[in-house]
């Protein structure tokens, strides 16, 4: 692996750990040239289905799009990076488990909402407002009321 600091080819692994419930390997590396240290994350690359967008276009699944959408909803919220990564892994595993070659973006959106509801209710409402295209305050109220009812049912 190339050093991100000096671009030398030779690096050594200083430490390796399983993270995200064993779905990733976190490695601390050290450059043998400049001796800078950096972290890498390793995950198995698996074929994901195409995403069918609302307008009918088909695009490859990009985990970075999933992550950035969730990060936007979670901005300035007390959710750890580890919890976010676990949620992303849960979503991608569910998508893969379905075994379909194509999956509707609405299905992905519902999976994201399920994970955000579990992680942080404010982030859930933020995401829902964009995903469900809220038109006015009544849409927010309706979503919050639904959340309250779900919380009562769980109690």
Swiss-Prot record:
The keyword Transmembrane does not apply. Its cofactor is Zn(2+). A zinc finger (unnamed) spans 3-34. Belongs to the NrdR family. It comes from Legionella pneumophila subsp. pneumophila (strain Philadelphia 1 / ATCC 33152 / DSM 7513). It comes from the Bacteria. Keywords: ATP-binding, DNA-binding, Metal-binding, Nucleotide-binding, Repressor, Transcription, Transcription regulation, Zinc, Zinc-finger. Transmembrane segments: none annotated. Negatively regulates transcription of bacterial ribonucleotide reductase nrd genes and operons by binding to NrdR-boxes. Residues 49-139 form the ATP-cone domain. GO terms for molecular function: ATP binding; DNA binding; zinc ion binding. The keyword Repeat does not apply. This is Transcriptional repressor NrdR. Binds 1 zinc ion. One of its GO terms (biological process) is negative regulation of DNA-templated transcription.
